C-alpha cells in the first residue's frame, strides 16, 4: 500500500511540472477600451470638424452639413497606429450645395423655417506623428423641421412644399427663363429642383432652389432646353414666383425674381473624383497620398439618409418617443474588434491595420456630453 501511495504522489508531481504552455493572446484584441471624451474638448471639436469636411467632400448631391454640437465622443488609442475616434454629431444643413465646394466656414445654417437637422455617426482615424487623417466610415440621417412646429412659431412664414408640385416647376422654369433672357450669351437648362417653399403674400408665392447646366442652344432656340445633355450641373439658382391680383381678364399678375451662383470648376480624374483627395490632402505629406488606382479602398463607407418630417401625434403623452434620427454604423459586431487594413495610407512594406470595435451606445458616455448647441433647433 505504501508503494502504491508513493507512485500516485510521483505521478501528480510529474503532471504539475509538465504544465502546458500558456495560451497565446487572442488575435486582434483591442489595445485598450474605448475612452469617453468631453464633447466640448478642443481635440474632439477639431476631429469633428475634419470628419464633417470629409463627409461633405465625398457627396455628389445635396447641401453641405455643419456642426451644431458634438453629441458623444469616444477614442481608441492604438499605440503606434494613433487613434480611432467614434463620434456622434448633431448637424444642420447649410445653404451651400456640395457641388459648390465652398469652405464650410463660409456656409451658415438655414433660416429656422427651412431647418433641416439630424445626426451623423463617424469613425475618424488620426495619426499625428505620421500626419494621417482618414474617415473610414460614416452614416447620417436628416429630417426637416415639421410644419406644425414652424406654424406654431411663425404662422405666416413659408413652409416646405412637394418638389414635384406643378407650381414649383412653374416657379423654376419661369425664373430660369428670366435669367436666360437677361444673359443671352449663354443659355442654361434646368437639372432639378432641390428646395421649395410656399407662402401667401398678396397671393400664392413660391420660392425655389434648383441646379442648372449649360445648354447647347442660343436664346432663339426655344426647344433647345428639351435636348438631352450629359453635362454636369454648373450652378445653383434661387427663384421666386409671386402671384398678386391682376387686372381683368388676367386673374393674377406674376412677379418673378432670380439669382444664380456658379460653381468653381473641379478638375476631375478619369472615372470621377479621386477619393484619396477627400482625406484632407493639405494635412498629409505627398508620400502618404493614396494611389489613384485604389479608389474603392480609400473611399469612406457611408451615406446620408433623408427622412420626412416627424410629426408629434396629439395623443403622444405617456408614450415612448420615436427615435428622431435613427443612425446605424457598425463595421463589426465582434465585441473583441476586427481589423481594418489601412496600409494604403502609409505606403510602407509592412501591413498597417486599425482595430475597429462596435460603435458604442449611450452607456459610459462622458458627463460633459452632449456639448452646447451652436444654434437651437425648433
Curated annotation (Swiss-Prot):
The keyword Repeat applies. Gene3D superfamilies: 3.10.450.10. Protease inhibitor required for egg fertilization. Required to prevent premature zona pellucida hardening before fertilization, probably by inhibiting the protease activity of ASTL, a protease that mediates the cleavage of ZP2 and triggers zona pellucida hardening. The modification Phosphoserine is found at residue 316. One of its GO terms (biological process) is single fertilization. It is found in: Secreted. Belongs to the fetuin family. Residues 286-297 have a biased composition (Polar residues). The keyword Signal applies. Residues 28-141, 152-261 form the Cystatin fetuin-B-type domain. This is Fetuin-B. Residues 1-18 form the signal peptide. One of its GO terms (molecular function) is cysteine-type endopeptidase inhibitor activity. PANTHER family: FETUIN (PTHR13814), FETUIN-B (PTHR13814:SF10). One of its GO terms (cellular component) is extracellular space. Disulfide bonds join 96-107, 120-140, 154-157, 217-224, 237-260. Glycans are attached at residues 40, 139, 289, 292. Residues 362-378 have a biased composition (Basic and acidic residues). The gene is Fetub. InterPro entries: Cystatin_dom, Cystatin_Fetuin_B, Cystatin_sf, Kininogen_Fetuin_HRG, Prot_inh_fetuin_CS. Liver. Keywords: Disulfide bond, Fertilization, Glycoprotein, Metalloenzyme inhibitor, Metalloprotease inhibitor, Phosphoprotein, Protease inhibitor, Repeat, Secreted, Signal. Residues 266-338, 357-378 are annotated as: Disordered.
Amino acid at each position: 500500500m505504501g508503494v502504491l501511495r508513493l507512485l500516485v504522489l510521483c505521478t501528480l508531481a510529474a503532471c504539475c511540472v509538465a504544465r502546458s504552455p500558456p495560451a497565446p493572446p487572442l488575435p486582434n484584441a483591442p489595445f485598450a477600451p474605448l475612452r469617453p471624451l468631453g464633447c466640448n474638448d478642443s481635440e474632439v471639436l477639431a476631429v469633428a470638424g475634419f470628419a464633417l469636411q470629409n463627409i461633405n467632400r465625398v457627396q455628389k448631391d445635396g447641401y453641405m452639413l455643419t456642426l451644431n454640437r458634438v453629441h458623444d465622443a469616444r477614442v481608441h488609442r492604438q499605440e503606434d497606429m494613433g487613434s480611432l475616434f467614434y463620434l456622434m454629431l448633431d448637424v444642420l444643413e447649410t445653404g451651400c450645395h456640395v457641388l459648390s465646394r465652398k469652405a464650410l466656414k463660409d456656409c451658415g445654417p438655414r433660416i429656422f423655417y427651412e431647418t433641416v437637422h439630424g445626426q451623423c455617426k463617424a469613425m475618424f482615424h488620426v495619426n499625428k506623428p505620421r500626419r494621417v487623417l482618414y474617415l473610414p466610415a460614416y452614416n447620417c440621417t436628416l429630417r426637416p423641421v415639421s410644419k406644425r412646429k414652424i406654424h406654431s412659431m411663425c404662422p405666416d412664414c413659408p413652409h416646405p412644399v412637394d418638389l414635384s408640385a406643378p407650381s414649383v416647376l412653374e416657379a423654376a422654369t419661369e425664373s430660369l427663363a428670366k435669367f436666360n433672357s437677361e444673359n443671352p450669351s449663354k443659355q442654361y437648362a434646368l437639372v432639378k429642383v432641390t428646395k421649395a417653399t410656399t407662402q401667401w403674400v398678396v397671393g400664392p408665392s413660391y420660392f425655389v432652389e434648383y441646379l442648372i447646366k449649360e445648354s447647347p442652344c442660343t436664346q432663339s432656340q426655344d426647344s433647345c432646353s428639351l435636348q438631352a445633355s450629359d453635362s454636369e450641373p454648373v450652378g445653383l439658382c434661387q427663384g421666386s414666383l409671386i402671384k398678386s391680383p391682376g387686372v381683368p381678364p388676367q386673374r393674377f399678375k406674376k412677379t418673378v425674381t432670380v439669382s444664380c451662383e456658379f460653381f468653381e470648376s473641379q478638375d476631375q480624374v478619369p472615372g470621377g473624383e479621386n477619393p484619396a483627395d477627400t482625406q484632407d490632402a493639405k494635412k498629409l505629406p505627398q508620400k502618404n497620398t493614396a494611389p489613384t488606382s485604389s479608389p474603392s479602398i480609400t473611399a469612406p463607407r457611408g451615406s446620408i439618409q433623408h427622412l420626412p418630417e416627424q410629426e408629434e401625434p396629439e395623443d403622444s403623452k405617456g408614450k415612448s418617443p420615436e427615435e428622431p434620427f435613427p443612425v446605424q454604423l457598425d463595421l463589426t459586431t465582434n465585441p473583441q474588434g476586427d481589423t481594418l487594413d489601412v496600409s494604403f495610407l502609409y505606403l510602407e512594406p509592412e501591413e498597417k491595420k486599425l482595430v475597429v470595435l462596435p460603435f458604442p451606445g449611450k452607456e459610459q458616455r462622458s458627463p460633459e456630453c452632449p456639448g452646447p448647441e451652436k444654434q437651437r433647433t425648433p
